[in-house]
A protein has these predicted regions:
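Aromatic/hydrophobic pocket-lining residues that form π-stacking "cages" and hydrophobic walls in ligand
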Residues: 66, 93, 127
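Short acidic active-site motifs
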Residues: 62, 88-94, 123
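Short beta-strands and strand-loop turn motifs
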Residues: 3-4, 45-50, 79, 106-109
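Short beta->alpha junction loops
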Residues: 79-87
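Redox- and metal-dependent alpha/beta enzyme cores, enriched for Fe-S-associated oxidoreductases
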Residues: 23-73, 80
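Intrinsically disordered or low-complexity boundary/linker segments at protein termini
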Residues: 1-41, 45, 130-139
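Short, well-ordered secondary-structure micro-motifs
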Residues: 14-15, 30, 55-60, 90-92, ...
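Gly/Ser-rich helix-loop-strand patches that form or flank binding pockets
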Residues: 1-10, 97-139
């Protein structure tokens, strides 16, 4: 799903992209889907949002491998990590995109029960309702 804000458009493709990264099928799918919207040689930042110690296990993150693959395709790639609490991960990712000057924010979309979303927060919901820039969500 590509969500465009009234004041933002992607005419000609995205030049600066922030991809929310986690070792999940949804995040990987979203990252691959975003390449269809990226301009040749676009700047891409892979951002991991760390909200608990288990999220930061060294050696278990594939974003470096994906960054290498993107580099080989001619993209200018960087990786970063942001710390967040469980209830502000979406806002943290939006902040990373704004700091990077991104014209597209990409993330995997997760579907959970309403109770689950209420208890831990809904990153997907935050991205849909709070992002001032275009968002690509893939599931």
């Amino acid at each position: 799903v590509l969500v465009l804000t009234p004041e933002a458009a992607l005419e000609g493709g995205a030049e600066r992209i922030v991809m929310g990264w986690s070792d999940t099928r949804e995040a990987t799918r979203a990252a691959h889907d975003a390449l269809a919207l990226a301009r040749s040689g676009a700047e891409i930042q892979l951002v991991s949002v760390i909200s608990r110690a288990a999220d930061a296990v060294p050696g278990l993150d594939s974003k470096d491998d994906f960054a290498t693959a993107l580099d080989r395709l001619g993209y200018k790639v960087s990786v970063s990590e942001r710390n967040a609490t469980a209830d502000n991960r979406g806002e943290t990712l939006i902040g990373a995109a704004q700091d990077f000057g991104a014209d597209l924010l990409v993330a995997g979309a997760f579907g959970h029960s309403q109770l689950y979303d209420f208890v831990i927060g809904a990153v997907t919901r935050d991205l849909l309702y709070k992002s001032p820039l275009p968002v690509l969500l893939s599931k």
